[in-house]
Amino acid sequence: MHKVLKFLAMLAILVCASLHELHAQYDKDMFMMRGRHALSEGKYAQAIENFNVLSQLDTADYWTFFFRGIAKYNLGDLRGAKTDFDRSVRLNPIFTNGYHYRGITESRFGNYESALADLQKAIDLRPGYVGLYFSRGVTYFLAQQFDKAIKDFDRYIRKEPKDPSAYLNRGASYLFLGDTLKAVNDYNKAIKLDRFDPEGYVRRGRLYASQKMHDLAIEDMNKAIELDTSNTFAYFNRAIMYYEQEKYQDAMNDLNRVLEDEPGNALTLYNRGLISAQLGAYDDALNDMDRVLNINPENVLAYFNRASIFIEMGMYENALEDYDRAIGLYPDFAKAYMNRSYVKNLLGRYKDAKRDYDTAQKKVAEYRAKNVSDAGSFADTTRKYSSLLSLDAEFAKKDFDDELLQHRDID
């Protein structure tokens, strides 16, 4: 009898342990299912909550850290995402997806060497997955290695010939190499594959605009806006095209539309300020330049153009202060010296004006002696500093996600 009771007790312990183990496994499966569902629905904070619990239940599950990294990446927490991707590949050194997404994250940091190393590791582990070549092509593009980017997009297109995004990316690479014919052919192919994606029309429209084919460019932007009425990048580009055609009110309307959705868009504020000044609405122009400088107090061109607005308003001392700031930020700014000389002459400060004039001439001579071809240089006095700026302006690069192409998702 005693032996029977002992056996039953041991059996009960084993049953309880098994039930506990089953319950724990059920909990893990439940949190994984909830987390992945939230991830697929774009509910990234909710996904992280589930993966946080799961990471405590099982500290060795590399998928948990990987999926949590994906959620953090999509929320913009790139450092947190990288930490989780690091953890996933430490737990499983042959985990392709971990290297893939860590590489993508490194590229977002601008760490292209590390990014390419991770993507190469992923390719070595899984050479048949062409999505890796797409992602590496994007990284090569961001690293301005356009020839290599094209080769990777070629390889991807051979396997996935009906993916319009690959043609858009390869077209952008050709464009940066100056091959506009191949670029427009790729944009045409992308549009043919997906006539309802505004991105193809925006890119082709920008290419047409660069070739001064403004009617075709505006036609493409109109189509992009028809497909996506909230596409601020299309409105912004169409505004510049209208400006080139001297349709200033149409340009102003498009810039206003951008600012409805993105009131802190410095580049759009800057361009609207220039148009307002050109139309004689100096108070409005001054307000926009003030807002630009509140966003970025080291914006050289905003100081330069606000000074011009002050001159039109007869506020010469204010203009001098802004030219001083522009020159302080960029001492080789010949045009700023020239304009400051003009203002000092108006104020009767002739010796100082002559000194600025001489400095401007010296800067111009030095610049021309270098035979610099960069038309965007602040020292190039042939540039129209009162013209609208596109995305070549340093201070504007954060305003639009222009050529930052998307990597392939995990399969």
Describe every region a protein language model picked out.
Residues 1-9:
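Bacterial N-terminal signal peptides that target proteins for export
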Residues 8-18:
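Bacterial N-terminal signal peptides
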